[in-house]
């Protein structure tokens, strides 16, 4: 069943220059006080072009300083494996291999396997091999826009296709055709959150909230003895320095990932057309639909992250169809109608509170 709420549309002014803001951010409604029986600790840091915040119950007397060091080391390992911003990373080596086999680590293999799984399940709406197309539109690691033409788009598309990836599981190796480029940006942050959560659980920590770049995974309860309450951003004015909440959602041993087209885009100075970073792998062009943001809830942040991207490609109608046909996924979608009026859909299974706006 649909759950719809109409909200006031934001006033927008098209400006003829390039705007780029790293990441999508989710407000975290963290508990202010701790219960008398168990202290909670919060660790903060920077990673993957964003920030992280980890809050956990200190019922196992974990050394916070030591854990903080392990977290940073783990995030560094993930970057060394899957960051296109690191020239010496495994993914950079794979993309420069010109068809040769490259030995990869367990983390790379897990993310690659999940990426292909989601690509198949979404009929290519999620595709980890569109790195060449992403770079053409100026959303790659170097942020340099190419000469965008129908010819160049088709040439870039010809260098993509997840079904062209070859994997040798016994040798832990991968091969991609010459000119192909793998990009895990739409799934790696979710994987990082899951990996950090598993690190906490290996320490015996049963109550925690892990947040990295707006992607969240929770378990157990917060310091007030409640399930974790997480805020979802309202996708408002692209130039706004502050942020407003659209909704507050209660997570019960669940993960949340949000994707949207309101913070990473550029505007054509001549036409005034806004081109957002979500690329449709079938057309090779930025996805054009009425969906402003998709927040997906799943047990794993990895899958929530990937499907949030797929939903932005699909648009709200296809995403609603997916959510209502899959018992393991839930979502909050913010979209507009033809007149620019805003609406919110949310899965009825979610415990959600809509935030009133003026």
Task: List each language-model region with its residue ranges.
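Mature catalytic core of soluble alpha/beta enzymes
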Residues: 2-21, 25-27, 32-358
């Amino acid at each position: 069943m649909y759950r719809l709420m109409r909200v006031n549309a934001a006033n927008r002014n098209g400006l003829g220059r390039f705007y780029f803001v790293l990441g999508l951010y989710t407000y975290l409604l963290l508990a202010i006080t701790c219960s008398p029986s168990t202290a909670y600790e919060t660790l903060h840091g920077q990673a993957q072009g964003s920030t992280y915040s980890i809050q956990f119950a200190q019922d196992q007397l974990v050394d916070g300083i030591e854990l903080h060091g392990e977290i940073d080391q783990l995030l560094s390992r993930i970057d060394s494996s899957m960051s296109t911003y690191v020239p010496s990373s495994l993914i950079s080596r794979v993309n420069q291999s010109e068809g040769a086999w490259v030995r990869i680590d367990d983390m790379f293999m897990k993310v690659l396997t999940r990426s292909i799984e989601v690509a198949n399940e979404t009929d290519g709406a999620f595709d980890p091999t569109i790195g060449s197309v992403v770079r053409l539109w100026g959303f790659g690691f170097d942020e340099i826009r190419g000469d965008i033409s129908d010819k160049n788009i088709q040439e870039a598309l010809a260098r993509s296709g997840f079904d062209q990836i070859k994997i040798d599981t016994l040798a832990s190796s991968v091969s991609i055709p010459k000119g192909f480029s793998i990009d895990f940006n739409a799934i790696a942050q979710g994987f990082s959150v899951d990996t950090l959560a598993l690190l906490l659980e290996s320490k015996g920590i049963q109550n925690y909230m892990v947040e990295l770049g707006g992607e969240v995974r929770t378990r157990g309860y917060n310091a007030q003895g409640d399930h974790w309450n997480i805020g979802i951003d309202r996708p408002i004015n692209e130039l706004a320095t502050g942020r407003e909440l659209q909704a507050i959602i209660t997570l019960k041993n669940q993960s949340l990932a949000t994707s949207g087209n309101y913070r990473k885009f550029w505007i054509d100075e001549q036409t005034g057309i806004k081109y957002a970073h979500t690329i449709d792998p079938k057309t090779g062009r930025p996805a054009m639909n009425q969906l402003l943001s998709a927040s997906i809830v799943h047990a794993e942040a990895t899958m929530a992250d990937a499907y949030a991207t797929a939903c932005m490609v699909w648009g709200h109608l296809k995403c609603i169809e997916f959510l209502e046909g899959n018992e393991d996924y839930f979502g909050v979608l913010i979209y507009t109608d033809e007149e620019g009026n805003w609406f919110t859909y949310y899965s009825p299974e979610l415990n959600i509170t809509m935030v009133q706006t003026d």
